[in-house]
Amino acid sequence: MTIDATLDTSGASGADHGAHGDASHEEFHVQAVASHAPGNALAGEGYVAGIDLGGTKVLAAIFSPDGTIVSRAKVVTGRIGGIDVVDRMAAAVSEAAKVAGLNLSQVAAVGTGVPAPVNPVTGVVHMTPNIAGWENMPLKQELGRRLGGIPVAIDNDVRVAVIAEHGAGAGVGIRNMVGIWPGTGVGGGLILDGRIYTGSSSYAGEIGHITIKEGGAPCGCGGRGHLEAYCSRTAIVKQLEKLVRDGKKTRLTRIVGRDLLRAKSSDLAEAAALGDAVVMSVLDRTARYLAIGIASIANLLNPEMVVLGGGVVEALGDDFVENVAKRVRVQPFSATTVPLKIVASALGDDAGITGAAIIARQMQVGLHP
């Protein structure tokens, strides 16, 4: 296991640091980068850590009392799964604290997003397709134990990213906001009356599984016609693969080879930038279905803003967001759709660690389990 650690101050030396804890024999790479601007939602008592847990990497960051990121540490998630991933999360926090010049005991709270359904109250991850051996993982308890009893807050990763955008990104000052994150799937989160809405059993915001076409394309959950079956990267590349099988030609085969299911969001963006008509038509179809979903949500909740984030949106950029917004504005019942602001995520890759730090702050004052 190798951890890359970064000091977010101009005083970083650039020298390698040895790890401590479970990563005592690992290599660390330290360099100076610009600090994150302070934000009120990130400010609080003492230092906190935010963890962005993904299927391929674990990123941890330390936030100062004024909300500035002072250090980061990154480690691969690995293929072992189970408790090994929890060890890696703890090691990343420990190293980020060390690089910041802190003892682990000086970290007051830790927050983490998890790419899976999770109960924030019990702290149990029920299952995750990206991490083996995490069925009913008591993450809150296990991570806290490995960090010497530091309080831990956990939540779904997209919900955490939406919290970040509301507290320190595109949605600052917005009372009612929806976040939609198209990526491998389509995740979402709801901010109602200034607070994240979790529902009766903590699963509110599963926007990817609203039905937009009865009996439509199969979804990974087993249903049909869900938003995720039309607007995720997985759905986009499946549609492109079908068109190629039917005889359509696309530059994407030159970029990724004949196995189009390997295409990343950046590959789709590259093909679109080259004017690939097949890719552009599928992305236009994606924007159309996403607009249908957004209009339905707008009619139900009447939010002020929809923030679009995730790998697909980050790769395709403002043109895609504007295409979606244009299609939303022409949907029926214009009272909810025309005034709706539709914007891209402002925090990008930092949304995960930022939202995780915010839920740690909220836990400190009793606003998050």
Per-region residue spans from a language model:
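A charged helix-plus-loop insertion that forms the helical arch/lid used to bind
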Residues: 124-135
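Short hydrophobic alpha-helix segments
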Residues: 73-75, 129, 200
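ATP-binding/phosphotransfer module of carbohydrate and carboxylate kinases, centering on a glycine-rich
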Residues: 1-109, 118-124, 143-151, 164-174, ...
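Conserved A3 ("GATE") glycine/threonine-rich loop of ANL adenylate-forming enzymes
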Residues: 57, 160, 184-187, 214
